[in-house]
C-alpha cells in the first residue's frame, strides 16, 4: 500500500510539473502523450479564459501570442497563496507586479503593465466586494462630526494614465503628474471610474487615514498641507467639494456615540 501511494504521488507530481512547464518536463512515464497534451491544453485554456475576461486591455496590448506567453509563464513560475478559483485574478496582478525587475523576453513588456493589470482588476474586485453603502447622514454635520469614506468608493493613484492605455497608446515614459482616480460602485452594481483633482483625492485619503478627525479639522489640515495663504477661502472651497462628495454618497458622517445610563 505504501509503495502504491508513493507511486501515485510520484505520478501526480510528474503530471503537475508537466502541466506547469511542458518545455522543461515530460509527461509521466507510461502516460499517453496525446492524453497528456489534452490535459495541458485544458488547463491553459481554462486559465486564459478566466483571466482574459478580467484583463481585456492587457490582452489587447500584448496581442494573442504575447498574452498566451504571459499566462503560460504565470502557470509555470508563480505559486498562488489561495486555492480559491475566484481569487486567481488578484494573484495574477501580484505576479505581473513581480516582473518589474525581471520582465524577461518571452512576451512583450511595458513598464505600465503592473498598473494596468491592477486597474483592470479593481473593477472586478469592487463588483464582488461584500460591503454595504454608507448610511444616509445629515450634511449639516459634515464640519462637526468625524467623516467616513464609503467602502464602495476607492481613491487610487497611478504613475501612468491607466485609463487611456491601449494598443494605440503605449507610452514609454510616465507623465509628469500622477493619475488620480475615484472608483465607485453605484446602486445598480455598475463600477464607475472618474478622474479627480489632487484636492479631492487627498481629502478622501485623509478621511481614511484620520477617521477620528472631524470635517472642520480635516479641511484646515488640508489647507496647511497645501500651504494656502488664504485659509478661510481655501476651506470654503474645500467645503463645497466635501458637500459634492457627500451628495455622491462617497463620504458620510460618523454616527454619534450612544451613551447608556447605568441603572
Summary of predicted features, one role per range:
Residues 246-259:
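A short, conserved structural fragment
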Residues 224-238:
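Short, positively charged loop/turn segments that connect secondary-structure elements
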Residues 76-201:
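Hydrophobic packing positions characteristic
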Residues 1-129:
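N-terminal, charged low-complexity regulatory/assembly segments
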Residues 212-224:
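Short acidic, hydrophobic short linear motifs in intrinsically disordered regions
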Residues 206-211:
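Short helix-to-turn junction characteristic of helix-turn-helix DNA-binding domains
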Residues 237-249:
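Basic amphipathic alpha-helical segments that dock to polyanions
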Amino acid at each position: 500500500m505504501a509503495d502504491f501511494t508513493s507511486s501515485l504521488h510520484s505520478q501526480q507530481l510528474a503530471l503537475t510539473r508537466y502541466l506547469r512547464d511542458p518545455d522543461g518536463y515530460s509527461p509521466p512515464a507510461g502516460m499517453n502523450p496525446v492524453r497528456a497534451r489534452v490535459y495541458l491544453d485544458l488547463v491553459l485554456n481554462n486559465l486564459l479564459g478566466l483571466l482574459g475576461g478580467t484583463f481585456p486591455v492587457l490582452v489587447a496590448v500584448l496581442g494573442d501570442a504575447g498574452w498566451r506567453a504571459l499566462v503560460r509563464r504565470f502557470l509555470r513560475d508563480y505559486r498562488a497563496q489561495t486555492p480559491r478559483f475566484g481569487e486567481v485574478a488578484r494573484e495574477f496582478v501580484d505576479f505581473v507586479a513581480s516582473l518589474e525587475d525581471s520582465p524577461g523576453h518571452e512576451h512583450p513588456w511595458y513598464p505600465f503593465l503592473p498598473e494596468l493589470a491592477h486597474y483592470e482588476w479593481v473593477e472586478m474586485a469592487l463588483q464582488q466586494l461584500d460591503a454595504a453603502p454608507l448610511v444616509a447622514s445629515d450634511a449639516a454635520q459634515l464640519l462637526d462630526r468625524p467623516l467616513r469614506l464609503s467602502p464602495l468608493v476607492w481613491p487610487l493613484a497611478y504613475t501612468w494614465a491607466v485609463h487611456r492605455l491601449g494598443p494605440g497608446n503605449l507610452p514609454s515614459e510616465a507623465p509628469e503628474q500622477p493619475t488620480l482616480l475615484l472608483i465607485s460602485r453605484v446602486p445598480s452594481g455598475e463600477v464607475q471610474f472618474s478622474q479627480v483633482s489632487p484636492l479631492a483625492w487627498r481629502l478622501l485619503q485623509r478621511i481614511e487615514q484620520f477617521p477620528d478627525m472631524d470635517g472642520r479639522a480635516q479641511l484646515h489640515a488640508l489647507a496647511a498641507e497645501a500651504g494656502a495663504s488664504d485659509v478661510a477661502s481655501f476651506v470654503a472651497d474645500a467645503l463645497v467639494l466635501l458637500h459634492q462628495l457627500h451628495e455622491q454618497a462617497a463620504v458620510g458622517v460618523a454616527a454619534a456615540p450612544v451613551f447608556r445610563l447605568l441603572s
